Amino acid sequence: MAIYAIGDIQGCYNELQQLLEKIRFDAAQDRLWLVGDLVNRGPDSLRVLRLVKSLGDRAITVLGNHDLHLLAVAAGEAELHRGDTLDEVLNAPDRDELLVWLRHQRLLYAEAGYVLVHAGLLPQWSVTQALGLAQEVEQALRGDDYAVFFEHMYGNSPHGWRDDHRGYKRLRVIANALTRMRICTPQGDMEFKFKGEVEKVPHGYLPWFDLPGRKSAEVTVIFGHWSALGLQVRGDVIALDT
């Protein structure tokens, strides 16, 4: 059995199929770990969702910001952006089945010294704490009033974590860290506009994974989201958004 980790697919079904053929993926015994952003930008989000869903427990995916955006649009709590390629999913006959499945995916997964997340973990979060916080958002997504979460999801503040955050403000910080973060201050204050190369990170900020004392440094975090990083492989992180 082999486990293959794959970066942001973003609706690129043909490229995904070519990759699976190249690695000779065998759904009977191999597993896929997907860093999220299954949908949007590419032309075939619908086929990507159908394929990953069909793999059942052979594929583990965490949710990315584009996946959450699709769910928010479908719930009537967000508008499509220019350049979105989600219409085919939203108009599909199996739309509801696919969206329910997507809502029930994780935001964070940990196994055997590896952690799978779309964007990153705040420096003050241990893996155990982060898993618990991710479950708070997952429960909101899976509940009957999930649309209320999407009503409050968008926004950049609060910029950092505090244990006494409550309600949807708390859930927003958790979701932003796990699905949108690239850089933050040593205190864990996030900045969301920057998308460039590491060498151009604004003064006072660092890539989340380079912060001294990061509590998740004892595991290898597999993530995507930051395309300007390219492929990065080191002991404590593997970046796959290439």
List where the protein language model places each region.
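N-terminal active-site segment of His-dependent metallophosphoesterases
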Residues: 1-55, 68
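Active-site-proximal beta-strand elements of phosphoester/diester hydrolases
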Residues: 2-10, 114-120, 238-240
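Short, conserved active-site loop motifs that form the nucleotide-linked donor/cofactor pocket
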Residues: 3, 30, 59, 114, ...
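Active-site neighborhood of phospho(di)ester-bond hydrolases with catalytic His/Asp-centered motifs
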Residues: 6-7, 33-36, 61-64, 221-224, ...
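Short, basic, glycine/proline-bearing loop/turn elements
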Residues: 31-36, 79-90, 190-197
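Active-site neighborhood of divalent metal-dependent phosphoester bond hydrolases
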Residues: 46-49, 54-169
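Conserved beta-sheet core of the metallophosphoesterase superfamily
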Residues: 125, 130-138, 200-242
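Acidic, glycine-rich loop-and-strand cores that form catalytic or ligand-binding grooves
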Residues: 166-201
